Amino acid sequence: MRGHPGGEENSRRMIALSGLAPGASILDLGAGAGETVALLRALGYEAGGIDLAPRGAHVKKGDLLRVQAESDGYDGLISQCAFYLSGDIPAAFREAYRLLRPGGVLMYTDVCFAPARPIAEAAGFEIRYYEDMSALWREYYIEALWRGTADCCGIKGRCGYEMLICGKD
């Protein structure tokens, strides 16, 4: 699982930090090939995902800015490297807030040019955990250059990478 910095280890860490118990309903926003969805399901969560170009089991076509789901419908959301790609980070946080039940948790990691914390707070979230993971982004980027799969040369050196665990109370 190398579709995002830190791979499966980072996904497991986010899940642990969320405090969500197995059986909770979790939607992966920007699920891609569904690797994180598969991990969540293996850990006992009721998990599915959406992506503009779905490529995995339990991943449906959908736009994270306009999710076809009821408000307050999920215990948890996870998004790794997807809000930035949506083109509208504030709208992505607002949509995530709408989707979560009261007491729900958003697990978020992404590239950032400015801190996401104030954007998440403006959407209504309480920040429960924050970590600057820019060193992990640099390692991931260098590895992608080495493999010849880096397609984001325009952003190198100008961005960071951060993790937020956000609650909806």
Model-derived regions, located:
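Conserved alpha-helix/loop element of class I SAM-dependent methyltransferases that forms part
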Residues: 4-22
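A short glycine-rich, Lys/Arg-flanked "PGG" loop and its adjoining helix->strand segment in the class I
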Residues: 90-105
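A short acidic, Gly/Pro-enriched loop at the edge of an enzyme's catalytic core
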Residues: 65-77
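A short SAM/SAH-binding and catalytic strip from SAM-dependent methyltransferases
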Residues: 76-88
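Conserved Class I S-adenosyl-L-methionine
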Residues: 132-169
